[in-house]
Structure formats: structure tokens, C-alpha cells
Curated annotation (Swiss-Prot):
Reported biotechnological use: Immunizes 1/3 of injected mice against subsequent infection with E.coli strain CFT073, suggesting it might be a good vaccine candidate for ExPEC (extraintestinal pathogenic E.coli) strains.
Gene3D superfamilies in the record: Tetratricopeptide repeat domain
A GO molecular-function descriptor: IgA binding
One GO cellular component term noted in the UniProt record for this chain: cell surface
Record note on cofactor: The physiological metal is unknown.
Record-listed Mg(2+) binding positions: H122, E159, D161
Organism: Escherichia coli O6:H1 (strain CFT073 / ATCC 700928 / UPEC)
SMART domains: SEL1 (SM00671)
Signal peptide: 1-23
Upregulating conditions: More highly transcribed in logarithmic than stationary phase. Protein is not detected in bacteria growing in culture but is detected upon infection of mice (at protein level).
Subunit structure: Interacts with human secreted IgA (SIgA) at least via resides 244-260.
Keyword ATP-binding: no
Protein name according to UniProt: Secretory immunoglobulin A-binding protein EsiB
Length: 490
């Protein structure tokens, strides 16, 4: 909620308070009116000095006139003085003073002041954090039709922040704000309809709200709508439209849109493959600290592409940045690079990264960690632990791990030798993605089995395929059904 609240803290000098027209008054006339004690003129003169309009910019003079108007109880000036203390413009930043002046204006019903006072209580700036008090002021601003207040009320109910969480109420307040063009609220409504929060799930309506935000130029709306076109959710799948929207968001600096645009360009999903342009966008995302951008940049350097030479040093550098942020795939790939380099010290680094990724369920890392333990490279040889990690990878459907686990059972490495288990895992790998090693090893192992053991192995394999190779299992069932139809038609 903090991010959204910061977006609705009202900080601008103009267009926030409506001032009675002073007519076409020049600076000297304005000074005369201000010196005579006219509060409106004092505030306007403060504006002139603040912006350097018809005079030299002078923040000290501006603050003096703002204060004179505010001390007369002129509500717009009280609010403006609060802004100046909040921003530290013309005076040292002083949140406590900002709260004092905001409260004076808020108590007189100025919605902008009520909104900002609510934020001060929410963030604990100049006062102790008091979420209930913040909601009180947000509500007052919202009930006067202030879209920022309505958004903040939506946020409060969405997060359960100062009120009991209530998605229905959140949707109602977001709707009020969104109807006034509040883009954050449009995005929140898009999210709520996509998840069925406080409303029946409706991806088409979700897309409509994201579109409203995107059309207004909001980078998040563009990002979310691009995602919907990419996956074909709520709209017809359209990679070209997705690329356009990702590009619009990326140009505004959105790091997620930047790496996703890079991926579309690298894969050629909306035209010819453009790895060089992809590299540029990955780098923009990566340099903002986005772990996905760092991963994709590293991966492109790792494998290379037309116009992009392989660069191991760059790959290691960017994989490391992503890995240090906890990206499991980057950790696994970084470990793989170190393992290939060959020295004992590099093998140790590899094992460290394999362990981090494997603990998060990354199957390639589990497989590689199992192999390192089997070979005793970078770690003390431990066949029992190797078998444990290899099984974890095999049970996630990695056919190479299924073959390796079969070999572990075939040779009795860290487990009791079991040809039935070995055959079942080899057959699972063979069926999974037509792994040739699985097929060859299965045929070799079959010679070790009795007829009864082969039946047991076949039954066990069926269970493994159904559980650990579901796509292969679905293909098998489809073929069986087709075969049954053909047989029935004869």
C-alpha cells in the first residue's frame, strides 16, 4: 500500500486549491493588495516569488507571504504552507509543522489537506503511525469526491490497513476513483477481476480496466495489458499487440516490461528474431536491478546468438547479480558454468550455488548437485545424498535425472541394488521424452529381470510415468483411446 499512497500524496503547487480570481493584476498591484492584508493576494504573491513569475525566484519571500496568508486562517494558504514544510522548500523540511498546517486546513474541509494528512498518519511522518486515523482522513477526502482519497480507501480495504480487509468495499472505492480516471485504481480493478477478489472473476473486464489505464499512458496498465495479450487471457492472443504495449511501458522505464520486450525480440514472437535489440532491453532492465533482466542478459551472453558473441565473463557477472537476489535458475546456471571450468575451487563455488537453487526446488540444480555428490567434485563424495537429490530431480520430470537415478539403482550407489527400480526409471525416462540412454539402459537391465520382476517393473513404471511424466502419460492414454476406436471399427 505504501507505494500507492506515495503516488497520491498531493505535492503540486497549482491546480490543487481553487483560488478566487484576482483579475489581471500586475506584480506591483499584487504587492499593494498583499501589504494591505488581503490573504488571497498574499498567497498569490507567494506563488509569484515561488515560481519567479514577473520577479526573481525567491523561496524565502514566498514562504513569508504564504505564512502571512496562512496565519490569517486562509485555508488554501494553510495547505500550501503544509506542502512547503513537507517538501522542505523555502524552509528546512519539518513534518511536524506540515502536520500542524495540514490539520488546520483539513478541519475546515479542504480535501487535498485531508488526503495528505491521512498519508502523514499512515507513514508516521510528523506524528506516530496511526492507521485508523489515516483512514478517517482518507474517508473525508473520498466522500468529497477526491479520487486520491477514494483510491486510498480502496487501498485500505484491499490491504486491511486501518480497517478490516474487505475486497467488496475495496472494489467499490476503486470503482469511484477509476471512473474519475485514477490509473492506480484502474489497475487494481483489473487485478481484482483477474483474481476474483470481491467480484466474480472476469478476465474480459479485467482487460478493459487495464486498457483504460494503458490508454492513459500508465506504464503498469500497459504492462498488464501486454501480459494479457501475450498469454491470450481476456483477449485474443496477439504477440504483436503485446510487443507494442511492452514497448510503451519499457520506454517509460518499467524494468519488467523491458525484459519481457527483450524476450519477445530474442525469440522472434512478433517478427524476425532480434537478439541485439533484445540484449539492449535486457541490459536496461538488468541495470535497474531487475533479477529477471539480469538472468536473461546473462543467459544471452552464456549461449550467444546471431550478432551476440558468447561472453563467459559477462554471463558470470550478470548470473551472479541475479543469483544473489535469489533467482534459482540463475543460481543453477551460475553453478553449471563454474562446474564446467574444472578447478577444485570452481567446483566448490558450483556446489554452493547448486545447493541454494536445489533447496528452492530447481530441478537442474538438484540433478547437478546429485552428480557432484556422486563424483565427489567440489564436495565430499556422498552416494546416499546423491541418490536423494537425484530422486528429487527425477520426480520433477527431468529425464536425465530419471536415467541417472536408474543407474544409481542398477549399480547400488547409496541405495540397495534394485533392478526393478532401475528398469522402471529407465523406462520412465525413455517414455518421458524418448531419452535414448533411458531406452538403451532399460533394454540392458531387462536381461537381469525374471518374468515376474519385469511385470513388477512395468507396473511401477506406469505409476512413475503417470506421476512424474504427466505429458507422456497423456500421450499414452490418447494413443490407447485411438487404438481402441480403430479396433472397434474393424
Amino acid at each position: 500500500m505504501k507505494k500507492s499512497l506515495l503516488a497520491v500524496m498531493l505535492t503540486g503547487l497549482f491546480a490543487l486549491v481553487s483560488l478566487p480570481a484576482l483579475g489581471n493584476v500586475n506584480l506591483e498591484q499584487l504587492k499593494q493588495k498583499a501589504e494591505s492584508g488581503e490573504a488571497k493576494a498574499q498567497l498569490e504573491l507567494g506563488y509569484r516569488y515561488f515560481q519567479g513569475n514577473e520577479t526573481t525566484k525567491d523561496l524565502t519571500q514566498a514562504m513569508d507571504w504564504f505564512r502571512r496568508a496562512a496565519e490569517q486562517g486562509y485555508t488554501p494558504a494553510e495547505y500550501v504552507l503544509g506542502l512547503r514544510y513537507m517538501n522542505g522548500e523555502g524552509v528546512p523540511q519539518d513534518y511536524a509543522q506540515a502536520v500542524i498546517w495540514y490539520k488546520k486546513a483539513a478541519l475546515k474541509g479542504l480535501p487535498q489537506a485531508q488526503q495528505n494528512l491521512g498519508v502523514m498518519y499512515h507513514e508516521g511522518n510528523g506524528v506516530k503511525v496511526d492507521k485508523a486515523e489515516s483512514v478517517k482522513w482518507f474517508r473525508l477526502a473520498a466522500e468529497q469526491g477526491r479520487d486520491s482519497g477514494q483510491q486510498s480507501m480502496g487501498d485500505a480495504y484491499f490491504e486491511g490497513d486501518g480497517v478490516t480487509r474487505d475486497y467488496v468495499m475495496a472494489r467499490e472505492w476503486y470503482s469511484k476513483a477509476a471512473e474519475q480516471g485514477n490509473v492506480w485504481s484502474c489497475n487494481q480493478l483489473g487485478y481484482m477481476y483477474s483474481r476474483g477478489l470481491g467480484v466474480e472473476r472476469n478476465d474480459a473486464i479485467s482487460a478493459q480496466w487495464y486498457r483504460k489505464s494503458a490508454t492513459s499512458g500508465d506504464e503498469l496498465g500497459q504492462l498488464h495489458l501486454a501480459d494479457m495479450y501475450y498469454f491470450g487471457i481476456g483477449v485474443t492472443q496477439d504477440y504483436t499487440q503485446s510487443r507494442v504495449l511492452f514497448s510503451q511501458s519499457a520506454e517509460q522505464g518499467n524494468s519488467i516490461a523491458q525484459f519481457r520486450l527483450g524476450y519477445i525480440l530474442e525469440q522472434g514472437l512478433a517478427g524476425a528474431k532480434e537478439p541485439l535489440k533484445a540484449l539492449e532491453w535486457y541490459r536496461k532492465s538488468a541495470e535497474q536491478g531487475n533479477s529477471d533482466g539480469q538472468y536473461y542478459l546473462a543467459h544471452l551472453y552464456d549461449k550467444g546468438a546471431e550478432g551476440v558473441a558468447k561472453n563467459r565473463e559477462q554471463a558470470i557477472s550478470w548470473y551472479t547479480k541475479s543469483a544473489e537476489q535469489g533467482d534459482a535458475t540463475a543460481q543453477a546456471n551460475l553453478g553449471a558454468i563454474y562446474f564446467r571450468l574444472g578447478s577444485e575451487e570452481e567446483h566448490k563455488k558450483a556446489v554452493e550455488w547448486f545447493r541454494k537453487a536445489a533447496a528452492k526446488g530447481e530441478k537442474a540444480a538438484q540433478f547437478n548437485l546429485g552428480n557432484a555428490l556422486l563424483q565427489g567434485k567440489g564436495v565430499k563424495k556422498d552416494e546416499q545424498q546423491a541418490a536423494i537429490w537425484m530422486r528429487k530431480a527425477a520426480e520433477q520430470g527431468l529425464s536425465a535425472a530419471q536415467v541417472q537415478l536408474g543407474e544409481i539403482y542398477y549399480y547400488g550407489l547409496g541405495v540397495e541394488r534394485d533392478y526393478v527400480q532401475a528398469w522402471a526409471w529407465f523406462d520412465t525416462a525413455s517414455t518421458n521424452d524418448m531419452n535414448l540412454f533411458g531406452t538403451e539402459n532399460r533394454n540392458i537391465t531387462e536381461k537381469k529381470l525374471t518374468a515376474k520382476q519385469l511385470q513388477q517393473a512395468e507396473l511401477l513404471s506406469q505409476q512413475y510415468i503417470e506421476k512424474y511424466a504427466p505429458e507422456a502419460w497423456a500421450r499414452m492414454q490418447k494413443l490407447k483411446a485411438q487404438s481402441a476406436v480403430k479396433t472397434g471399427n474393424k
